[in-house]
């Protein structure tokens, strides 16, 4: 059984190309397995609160020493980690916002990157605890950031891959939907190219 966690995060919700392609990719990956199941974490329509003092302090305390507010904050993070840990495949849709991922997606990472839970410090450095998962990134941007003069300003793709790798998720494939504000022809070309890349990934997945 393939357990797929689909995470969408674009503020544009269903009008977003990253959301559209992420849903399509998750659906096709699930269709390979008669028992495949998709769990949706919609960070646009159901945003997470940003981390605060209650969470930072609460996660460092024993459970019986937490206030009600601290316990609630830590329980939310634990639920997100459990959801992520249970998945075999993770599909993340991310639309570039001011050169990086949206605050909605960052809020999710701020909850699941948890010392001694999703990564540990050891003699050889940091080791993630979420190995063995396949990750698919669907990233969208108004401009072209995979190459050309704006490539140095892509603080989305590499940043997300670094965060995922930090917690042990290093098997990452990416579909880019680029140039979405460069006119109708550019949008259609971006959609066609992303569709081809998506199909290739599905075929590679078997």
Swiss-Prot record:
Quinone reductase that provides resistance to thiol-specific stress caused by electrophilic quinones. Also exhibits azoreductase activity. Catalyzes the reductive cleavage of the azo bond in aromatic azo compounds to the corresponding amines. Belongs to the azoreductase type 1 family. Binds 1 FMN per subunit. Its cofactor is FMN. Homodimer. This is FMN-dependent NADH:quinone oxidoreductase 1. It comes from the Bacteria. The keyword Flavoprotein applies. FMN binds at residues 10, 16-18. It is an enzyme of class 1 (oxidoreductase).
């Amino acid at each position: 059984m393939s357990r797929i966690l689909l995470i969408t995060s674009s503020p544009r919700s269903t009008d977003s190309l990253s959301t559209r392609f992420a849903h399509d990719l998750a659906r096709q990956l699930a269709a390979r397995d008669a028992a495949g199941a998709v769990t949706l974490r919609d960070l646009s329509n159901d945003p997470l609160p940003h981390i605060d003092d209650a969470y930072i302090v609460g996660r460092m305390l024993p459970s019986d020493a937490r206030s009600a507010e601290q316990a609630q904050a830590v329980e939310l993070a634990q639920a997100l980690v459990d959801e992520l840990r249970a998945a075999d495949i993770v599909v993340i849709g991310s639309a570039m916002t001011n050169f990086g991922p949206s605050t909605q997606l960052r809020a999710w990472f701020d909850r699941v990157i948890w010392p001694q839970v999703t990564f540990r410090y050891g003699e050889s450095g940091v080791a993630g605890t979420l190995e063995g998962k396949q990750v698919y990134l669907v990233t969208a941007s108004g401009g072209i950031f995979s190459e050309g003069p704006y490539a140095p300003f892509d603080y989305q793709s590499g940043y997300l891959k670094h965060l995922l790798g930090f917690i042990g998720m290093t098997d990452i494939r990416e579909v880019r939907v680029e140039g979405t504000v460069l006119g109708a022809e550019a949008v259609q070309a971006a959609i066609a190219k992303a569709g081809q890349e998506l199909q290739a990934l599905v075929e590679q997945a078997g």
